[in-house]
């Protein structure tokens, strides 16, 4: 039997679909799952990146604000110290304020007004440094940066210093200092009021001084007087030399950097008339040495050049409690190294050491260089900070 041929106009029989083609055209379920999962991860990653970026911006602004706060706090701290020893630059009247007083003699040193009083209840001599007029100009610009050092002979260690007044020959001090001395002992004392020209990069120059034998003063009532400055006698103490170093403090990093630059006119320690100097740098806290650094040794010289930097970690909340002590020593290959002199800087040191420290804090991130006169090792110990 043969099948009937299809008649004209009748539809052709349908061919059943090929199952292999169906399998090739369909998308597997695991592919769809992978696509969905990948898309989700991509969206999540994008959102996470945006979130992290915003967080970093916020943290950056916060850290920047904290850094600004640290800088401002340290600057204010430095200004508070400067206010104790060194005011801002003042434009004071440079003409003599006393009628008819003119500085005609080019060798005239100037004059100083002071006051004296004795408090019998507390046993204290009160010395007032009021003002000076017509001081000698020791700077190249025709002016001076005067301050007054006050002490009672024979004790030179207990000194008081006024603030430094910038660029004036007629400073108004208005400061009072107290010396605790029994009244019966005052007759053998001599009051010395020495006027100096402050110089950051060299030794402070003596303008002149006033000496008042206390035996010649009637302290039954307050005394106020003008005295002409006299040429200061040469220091009796042996010169040990000078050292120049810079201080730099970065409050945001809590980093204190001391750069030992150079020394000059050091005391001769060797038989041949020279020395082999090096410098030890100590960081002290509470009067105790907590860190130590030292420079290289410079052979056969009294004017060594170092330019060596040392860094210490000092948190912002500890900067008032630390001091830095620099000791210049003479290296001895066979015997014991002998100290030539020391100098200390810090908030509790006073004098030039406090002045240098205050300038450093008032100018964070900037190195502040200054010359210091070396003191005998037994007299240069810093005062323990509170």
UniProtKB/Swiss-Prot annotation:
One of its GO terms (biological process) is regulation of calcium ion-dependent exocytosis. Residues 1-16 have a biased composition (Pro residues). One of its GO terms (molecular function) is calcium ion binding. Binds 3 Ca(2+) ions per subunit. The ions are bound to the C2 domains. It is a single-pass membrane protein. GO terms for cellular component: dense core granule; neuron projection; neuronal cell body; neuronal dense core vesicle membrane; perinuclear region of cytoplasm; plasma membrane; proximal neuron projection; recycling endosome membrane. Residues 108-227, 239-372 form the C2 domain. Its cofactor is Ca(2+). Pfam families: C2. InterPro entries: C2_dom (IPR000008), C2_domain_sf (IPR035892), Synaptotagmin (IPR001565). Signal peptide: none annotated. Residues 1-24 are vesicular. Ca(2+) 3 binds at residues 199, 202, 205. Residues 1-21 are annotated as: Disordered. Ca(2+) 2 binds at residues 138-139, 197, 199, 205. Belongs to the synaptotagmin family. Homodimer. Interacts with both alpha- and beta-tubulin. This is Synaptotagmin-5. It comes from Mus musculus (Mouse). The gene is Syt5.
């Amino acid at each position: 039997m043969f099948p009937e041929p299809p008649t004209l106009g009748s539809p052709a029989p349908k061919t059943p679909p090929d199952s292999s083609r169906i399998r090739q055209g369909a998308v597997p379920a695991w592919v769809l799952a992978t696509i969905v999962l990948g898309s989700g991860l991509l969206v999540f990653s994008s959102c996470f990146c945006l979130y992290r970026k915003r967080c970093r911006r916020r943290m950056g602004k916060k850290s920047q604000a904290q850094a600004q706060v640290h800088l401002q706090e340290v600057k204010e701290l430095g200004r508070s110290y400067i206010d104790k020893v060194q005011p801002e630059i003042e434009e004071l009247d440079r003409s003599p304020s006393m009628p008819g007083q003119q500085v005609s003699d080019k060798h005239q040193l100037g004059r100083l007004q002071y006051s004296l009083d004795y408090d019998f209840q507390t046993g204290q001599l009160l010395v007032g440094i009021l003002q000076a007029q017509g001081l000698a100009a020791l700077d190249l610009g025709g002016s001076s940066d005067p301050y007054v050092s006050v002490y009672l002979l024979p004790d030179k260690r207990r000194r008081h210093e006024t603030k430094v007044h910038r660029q004036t020959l007629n400073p108004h001090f208005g400061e009072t200092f107290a010396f605790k001395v029994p009244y019966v002992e005052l007759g053998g004392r001599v009051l010395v009021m020495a006027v100096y020209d402050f110089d950051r990069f060299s030794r402070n120059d003596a303008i002149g001084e006033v000496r008042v034998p206390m035996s010649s003063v009637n302290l039954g009532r307050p005394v106020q007087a003008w005295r002409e400055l006299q040429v200061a006698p040469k220091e009796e103490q042996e010169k040990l030399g000078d050292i120049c170093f810079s201080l730099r403090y970065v409050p945001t990093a809590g980093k204190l950097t001391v750069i030992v630059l150079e020394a000059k006119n050091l005391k001769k320690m060797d038989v041949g008339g020279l020395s082999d100097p090096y410098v030890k740098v100590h960081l002290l806290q509470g009067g105790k040495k907590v860190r130590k650094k030292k420079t290289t040794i410079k052979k056969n010289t009294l004017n060594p050049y170092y330019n060596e930097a040392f860094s210490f970690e000092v948190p912002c909340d500890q900067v008032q409690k630390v001091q830095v002590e620099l000791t210049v020593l003479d290296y001895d290959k066979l015997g014991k190294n002998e100290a030539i002199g020391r100098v200390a800087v810090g908030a509790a040191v006073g004098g030039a050491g406090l002045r240098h420290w205050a300038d450093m804090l008032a100018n964070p991130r900037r190195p502040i260089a200054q010359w210091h006169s070396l003191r005998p090792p037994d007299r240069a110990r810093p005062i323990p900070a509170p």
